[in-house]
Design a protein with these regions (language model features):
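Histidine-centered copper-binding motifs that mark active-site loops
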Residues: 1-187, 191-215, 222, 245, ...
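A conserved active-site cap/scaffold subdomain adjacent to cofactor or substrate pockets
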Residues: 176, 220-231
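Short, aromatic- and glycine-rich surface loops/edge beta-strands on solvent-exposed regions
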Residues: 41-47, 229-238
Length: 298
């Protein structure tokens, strides 16, 4: 088991063949170490594809001293992706055809629209660049909702996770992305979120409408709902599906599910290309691995 984000001795890090010999079938291993930090973290297997098949979970370490930020209710929001396919089969397909699960490929209609918008020359240069790299600007995620179901605290979108609250409460939501492959764009329509921690470390509070959470990241936010129901909407970065939850004062009341945001496309900047040599071209930026926030000051 790897204790993600926790400072500990190398021998307790849980990486077979590197930090320790591993745990043989039928055997046990006891992890012992002093916890030297507080915050929101998580654990997961480092053996084969065990993480993809469910060996992961949340870790919340309370501080020794009184917390600087006060709240009335505390929820973990564990995001993940699940496939009924054997992970070895998924991996084998990707090795043979990297875009096997990409069902958002460019069409002839897209080509015509791009020519109308940018002209033949720029469209040709753009397509040539991607073809030379044997890639597509729609290659947002290697594995998509074609095989994945996206979960929130183990619940599918059909069921949805439910968090109850009373009017006037300040709620701490500890978002953890324990997915194997998926980035999520998270928002709660009608409700501002104040980010107070990232990867277990306190940050200067900042109010946002949404944020992007990469694989293995954690973000803690504070929300202050009224007596309405709110949807926790975590859409996959490629818009092939979503994880769903509800904050509500009444378990029988649900909020509307919002529409997907537009499907993003990769740009030259995502490939690390020199923008200065491409003046006038459309450089859409995805911001992979970064916290994409709405309504950020400055």
């Amino acid at each position: 088991i790897h204790w993600h984000g926790i400072i500990l001795p190398t021998a307790m890090d849980g990486v077979p063949g590197i930090s320790f010999p591993g745990i043989a079938p039928g055997e046990t291993f006891t992890y012992r170490f002093r916890v030297q930090q507080s915050g929101t973290y998580w654990y997961h297997s480092h053996s084969g594809f065990q993480e993809q098949t469910g060996l992961y979970g949340a870790i919340v370490v309370d501080p020794k001293e009184k917390e600087t930020i006060q709240y009335d209710r505390d929820y973990v929001v564990l995001l993940s992706d699940w496939s009924d396919e054997d992970p070895d089969a998924v991996y084998a397909k990707l090795k043979k055809l990297s875009h096997y699960y990409n069902f958002n490929q460019r069409t002839a209609s897209d080509l015509i629209q791009e020519i109308r918008a940018k002209g033949v020359s720029q469209t040709w240069q753009n397509r040539q660049m991607w073809n030379q790299m044997r890639m597509s600007d729609t290659d947002i995620s290697d594995v998509t909702g074609y095989t994945y179901t996206f979960l929130m605290n183990g619940q599918t979108p059909a069921d949805g996770w439910v968090g109850l609250f009373r009017k006037g409460e300040r709620i701490r939501l500890r978002f953890i992305n324990s997915a194997a492959m998926t980035f999520f764009d998270v928002r709660i329509p009608g409700l501002k979120m104040t980010v107070i921690a990232a990867d277990g470390q306190e940050v200067e509070p900042i109010s946002v409408d949404e944020f992007r959470i990469g694989v293995a990241e954690t973000f803690d936010v504070i929300v202050e709902p009224d007596d309405s129901a709110y949807t926790l909407f975590a859409q996959a970065i490629d818009r092939s599906g979503y994880a769903l939850g509800t904050l509500t004062p009444d378990a029988s009341v649900r909020a509307e599910i919002p529409e997907f945001d537009p499907v993003p496309l990769l740009g030259h900047g995502d490939m690390g290309m020199d923008m200065s040599s491409m003046a006038g071209m459309d450089h859409a930026s995805m911001g992979h691995g970064a916290m994409a926030m709405g309504s950020m000051p400055g």
